[in-house]
């Protein structure tokens, strides 16, 4: 049999924040300088907290200190792929990954101007004009970065929805620049909910151009205060605010009005989705709120049908139990993500993760989820895929194993890591990425090693 087509639909890219200056409109440079001063102070405090952290809720800072510390030379060289194309392609080759879909970054202090991580900023910036300008600066750089990859990287533009007609123009620009989707911030109080008609021009242009709309995991809202439990609660609810989008789109009739619109969940887990869709389906068929009319009387597309026709999800840091739930979603709607270069993803042990998570899935369905669905969904060049698969694709049988799948074990330590949510791969993968090479050696056949 032929080698596997391995495409990650969850990668991250972004310049070190200061280097965005050349991509930012000049009129915003003064505000940008102020932001850089604030971020420098934030980083200093963040790294100090990481050095001092014990087995406390600050354990997350301790891990992230190792990831972000300029003195950690080996890690810093590997994560340079967030903005260094040569390093990135080398890491992809080592994993046998032929293509990636790229979202904004922020873990390595490389957030885009005024935007933080997916539009949520550690230094509160409420000015819509600044946040949108920063997103456009990132999109300009991302288009250049992807264009230089020879078709291996597909970029997703960050779109801020404050001015809907500016957002429409930004989508058209992104498409013309070669980007292949958009990502929106989670719903918040600064703009209407996504089911409101004001967003119809945005959905229309995305459907017209085939630009998939994404909701990606990111920072939770800044509503948790300064209590010792605040960070744990924030991470515990990380995906909650993203889940609201699906209900808004489905019950708001967005997929009825825009039947060609495509929507993708990325890095918010998939194990919760089947039950959530079942709940939406129940509400659709019943007068759940005792209002005298069930939604099916005024909405022609059921949630299950909308999911099958319009939606997909990426399994990032996938676990065995999570992929079992993919059966209920439909294997044609599930894709895989490595999350390079983030510490909580599968990189640099993607083969081990896939072998475990997809252990009981038939090989045809496994091939769909780890690459073939993504190749079709994001319109990768078939000839490019064929040539790269022949060169670096994981050999047939690589992900077939007789070993019993390992379920992640949660513990108090995992809570203090700050990465507890509905999918348990995060705690395992953070240890993979941050432990010493002696503990978790690089076993990738394609990896280049020092002689």
Task: Annotate each PLM feature.
Residues 10-15:
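Short polar catalytic/cofactor-binding loops
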Residues 19-33, 113-123, 167, 171, ...:
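Aromatic- and acidic-residue-enriched segments that line the glycan-binding/catalytic groove
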Residues 213, 217-220, 251-253, 259-308:
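Aromatic-lined glycan-binding groove of carbohydrate-active enzymes
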Residues 7-9, 100-102, 154-157, 182-184, ...:
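Hydrophobic faces of well-ordered beta-strands that scaffold small-molecule active sites
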Residues 2-5, 16-71, 76-79, 84-99, ...:
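Mid-to-C-terminal alpha-helical segments outside catalytic/metal-binding sites
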Residues 66-79, 83-87, 91, 95-245, ...:
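Active-site gating/metal-coordination segments in enzymes
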Residues 149, 178, 208-209, 257-261, ...:
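Structured helix-beta-strand junction loops
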């Amino acid at each position: 049999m032929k080698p596997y087509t391995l495409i990650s639909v969850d990668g991250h890219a972004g310049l070190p924040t200061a280097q965005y200056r050349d991509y930012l409109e000049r009129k915003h440079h003064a505000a940008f300088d102020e932001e850089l001063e604030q971020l420098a102070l934030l980083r200093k405090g963040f790294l100090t907290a990481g050095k001092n952290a014990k087995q406390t809720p600050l354990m997350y800072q301790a891990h992230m200190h190792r990831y972000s510390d300029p003195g950690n030379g080996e890690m810093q060289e590997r994560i340079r792929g967030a903005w260094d194309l040569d390093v990135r392609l080398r890491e992809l080759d080592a994993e046998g990954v032929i293509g990636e879909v790229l979202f904004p970054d922020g873990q390595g202090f490389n957030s885009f101007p005024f935007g933080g991580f997916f539009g949520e900023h550690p230094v509160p910036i409420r000015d819509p004009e600044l946040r949108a300008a920063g997103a456009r600066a990132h999109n300009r750089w991302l288009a250049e970065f992807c264009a230089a990859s020879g078709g291996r990287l597909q970029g997703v533009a960050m779109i801020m929805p404050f001015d809907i007609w500016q957002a429409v123009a930004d989508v058209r620009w992104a498409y013309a620049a070669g980007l292949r989707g958009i990502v929106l911030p989670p719903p918040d109080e600064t703009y209407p909910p996504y089911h409101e008609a004001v967003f119809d021009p945005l959905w229309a242009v995305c459907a017209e151009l085939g630009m998939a709309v994404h909701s990606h995991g990111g920072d939770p809202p800044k509503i948790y205060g300064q209590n010792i439990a605040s960070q744990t609660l924030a991470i515990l609810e990380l995906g909650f605010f993203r889940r609201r989008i699906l209900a808004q789109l489905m019950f708001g009739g967005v997929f009825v009005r825009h039947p060609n619109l495509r929507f993708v969940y990325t890095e918010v887990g998939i194990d919760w989705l089947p039950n959530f869709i079942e709940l939406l389906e129940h509400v659709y068929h019943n007068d759940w709120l005792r209002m005298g009319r069930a939604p099916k009387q005024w909405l022609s597309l059921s949630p299950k049908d909308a999911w099958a026709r319009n939606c997909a999800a990426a399994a990032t840091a996938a676990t065995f139990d999570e992929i079992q739930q993919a059966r209920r979603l439909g294997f044609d709607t599930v894709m895989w993500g490595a999350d390079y270069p983030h510490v909580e993803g599968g990189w640099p042990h993607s083969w081990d993760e896939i072998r475990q998570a997809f252990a009981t899935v038939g090989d045809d369905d496994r091939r769909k989820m780890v690459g073939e669905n993504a190749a079709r969904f994001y319109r990768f060049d078939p000839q490019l895929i064929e040539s790269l698969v022949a060169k670096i694709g994981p050999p047939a049988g690589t992900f077939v194993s007789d070993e019993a799948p390992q379920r992640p074990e949660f513990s108090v330590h995992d809570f203090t890591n700050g990465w507890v949510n509905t999918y348990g791969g995060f705690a395992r993968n953070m240890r993979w990425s941050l432990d010493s090479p002696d503990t978790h050696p690089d076993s990738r056949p394609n990896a280049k090693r020092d002689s």
